[in-house]
């Protein structure tokens, strides 16, 4: 069987043993790709590729709706969300739906509505995907030139980029509108242990918003992950939405500059590699956000961060021993350092013991007990509220540890049911997916650059050594 190569496409060609297999009317002879190469068979069939993308969107939205309803069906209002293995309901609660003071879930109906809306949307997308994959025109260029494209048409590609940017900007503004006008969102820092509130004075200062980007990603700086109030988060979304929309309009109205035309590879596989790189960055950032940030991901719904659980343990035992008569300000531990309290390198009063490494943690249940120089001894003696004790005791036993199958989880319950925090799930999954997307970016970028240079012609099977070897039998 001859090795296929199309100069028009500069794409590698796969030659299989079952090269005669025809799937959906497209075989290896006509497309240059075997059935398992998936959407590569549709590179030049814009109508069919549209069907594949719409159907894929339908699958994503179907998962969201079905999983949403599954979590609603299993939800127990009396238990914290993070104890129930939920990953979708915490996001809805963070947006302020169904939540009361202290992060208590008072109404699950909005969650049910969310699931149903996603299921209905997925049906529409699924129908559209099947229609375009099986019935609609194979190519859009002739019948619907606005939706048609050629991969090498740089102007059309940047127009499509612009449309995508406008849609992303609109998405960012949806959060801004929800926070400002439509009921507000959940603020873990609201006095008394968190509540839903409208954001009235969002941060628009470019110095503050873009200052996050100039911070070091390490240590106490923490880059954008260090954001610790909703005003900055919503202000950031306002800036992001504005930049995406104006950038989208710019890309629709302009043509790429000469240096851009020279610098980039202009092919379908190149665009795939750029997209994978962007998604990889998103995945790594999301991983850091959900692991470290207890403002964007409130601990009431996602469980405490690692440092938070550690500090909660120190606080819980300080409360207990103080009640039993211990002098928490002066008691020494086995190393001669303070058992309950000590000083940080810069002089603040911090919790003693192993949790000293997390001395710069900020958490809503702990901040009211600080003074101008770290933890305030008089507040620790007189001002500790019952809700702070309850919350820290709960967080102490729900540290985000353990493997994802919970074999190495923390045995926090009397019946030895191991606990795995949603923070562990979400951080690990986004890190792993971010890594795989990065590898996919390298793979497709390499292939796209090779194809553009003209030397990616597939494997020449005529001289493959195995063809000249004696059969095994």
Swiss-Prot record:
Gene Ontology biological process terms in this record: photosynthetic electron transport in photosystem II
Modified residues (N-acetylthreonine): 15
Lipid bilayer topology: Multi-pass membrane protein
GO cellular component assignments: chloroplast thylakoid membrane; photosystem II
MF GO annotations: chlorophyll binding; electron transporter, transferring electrons within the cyclic electron transport pathway of photosynthesis activity; metal ion binding
Record's keyword terms, sorted: Acetylation, Chlorophyll, Chloroplast, Chromophore, Manganese, Membrane, Metal-binding, Phosphoprotein, Photosynthesis, Photosystem II, Plastid, Thylakoid, Transmembrane, Transmembrane helix
Phosphothreonine modifications at: 15
Propeptide: 1-14
Transmembrane segments: 69-93, 134-155, 178-200, 255-275, 291-312, 447-471
Pfam families assigned to the protein according to its UniProt record, in alphabetical order: PSII
Compartments, record wording: Plastid, Chloroplast thylakoid membrane
Main subcellular location of this protein, as a coarse class: plastid
Record keyword Cell inner membrane present: no
Cofactor note: Binds multiple chlorophylls and provides some of the ligands for the Ca-4Mn-5O cluster of the oxygen-evolving complex. It may also provide a ligand for a Cl- that is required for oxygen evolution. PSII binds additional chlorophylls, carotenoids and specific lipids.
SUPFAM superfamilies in alphabetical order: Photosystem II antenna protein-like
Keyword Transferase on entry: no
Residues where [CaMn4O5] cluster binds: 367
Record-linked InterPro entries: PS_antenna-like, PS_II_antenna-like_sf, PSII_PsbC, PSII_PsbC_sf
Role according to the record: One of the components of the core complex of photosystem II (PSII). It binds chlorophyll and helps catalyze the primary light-induced photochemical processes of PSII. PSII is a light-driven water:plastoquinone oxidoreductase, using light energy to abstract electrons from H(2)O, generating O(2) and a proton gradient subsequently used for ATP formation.
UniProt xrefs under HAMAP family: PSII_PsbC_CP43
Family: Belongs to the PsbB/PsbC family. PsbC subfamily.
Subunit and partners: PSII is composed of 1 copy each of membrane proteins PsbA, PsbB, PsbC, PsbD, PsbE, PsbF, PsbH, PsbI, PsbJ, PsbK, PsbL, PsbM, PsbT, PsbX, PsbY, PsbZ, Psb30/Ycf12, at least 3 peripheral proteins of the oxygen-evolving complex and a large number of cofactors. It forms dimeric complexes.
Name of the molecule in the record: Photosystem II CP43 reaction center protein
Gene label: psbC
């Amino acid at each position: 069987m001859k090795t296929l190569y199309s100069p028009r496409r500069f794409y590698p060609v796969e030659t299989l043993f079952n090269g005669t297999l025809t799937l959906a009317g497209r075989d290896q002879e006509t497309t240059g790709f075997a059935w398992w190469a998936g959407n590569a068979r549709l590179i030049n069939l814009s109508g069919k590729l549209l069907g594949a993308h719409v159907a894929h969107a339908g699958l994503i939205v179907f998962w969201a709706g079905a999983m949403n309803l599954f979590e609603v069906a299993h939800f127990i209002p009396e238990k914290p969300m993070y104890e129930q293995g939920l990953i979708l309901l915490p996001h809805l609660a963070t947006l302020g739906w169904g939540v009361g003071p202290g992060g208590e879930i008072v109404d699950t109906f909005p969650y049910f509505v969310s699931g149903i809306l996603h299921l209905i949307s997925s049906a529409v997308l699924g129908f559209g995907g099947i229609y375009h994959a099986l019935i609609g025109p194979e190519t859009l260029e002739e019948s619907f030139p606005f939706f048609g494209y050629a991969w090498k048409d740089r102007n059309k590609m940047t127009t499509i980029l612009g449309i995508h940017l406008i849609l992303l900007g609109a998405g960012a503004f949806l959060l801004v509108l929800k926070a400002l006008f439509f009921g507000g969102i959940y603020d873990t820092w609201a006095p008394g242990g968190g509540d839903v509130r409208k954001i009235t004075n969002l941060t628009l200062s470019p110095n503050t918003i873009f200052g996050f980007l100039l911070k070091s990603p390490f240590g106490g700086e923490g880059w954008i992950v260090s954001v610790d109030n909703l005003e900055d988060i919503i202000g950031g979304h306002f800036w992001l939405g504005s930049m995406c929309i104006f950038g989208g309009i710019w890309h629709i109205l302009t043509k790429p500059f000469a240096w851009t035309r020279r610098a980039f590879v202009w092919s379908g596989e190149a665009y795939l590699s750029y997209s994978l790189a962007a998604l990889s960055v998103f995945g790594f950032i999301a991983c850091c956000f959900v692991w470290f940030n207890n403002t964007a991901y409130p601990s009431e719904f996602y469980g405490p961060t690692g440092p938070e659980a550690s500090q909660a343990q120190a606080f819980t035992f300080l409360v207990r021993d103080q009640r039993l008569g211990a002098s928490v300000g002066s008691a020494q531990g086995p190393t001669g350092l303070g058992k309950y309290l000590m000083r940080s390198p810069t002089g603040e009063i911090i919790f003693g013991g192993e949790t000293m490494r997390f001395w710069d943690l900020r958490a809503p249940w702990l901040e009211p007990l600080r003074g101008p120089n770290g933890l305030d001894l008089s507040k620790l003696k007189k001002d500790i509220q019952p809700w702070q004790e309850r919350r820290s005791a709960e967080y102490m036993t729900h540290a985000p540890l353990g493997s994802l199958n919970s074999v190495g989880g923390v045995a926090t319950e009397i019946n030895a049911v191991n606990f795995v925090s949603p923070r562990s799930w979400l951080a690990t999954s986004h890190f792993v997916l971010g890594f795989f997307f990065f590898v996919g970016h390298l793979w497709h970028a390499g292939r796209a650059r090779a194809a553009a240079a003209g030397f990616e012609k597939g494997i020449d099977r005529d001289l493959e050594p195995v063809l000249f070897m004696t059969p095994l039998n």
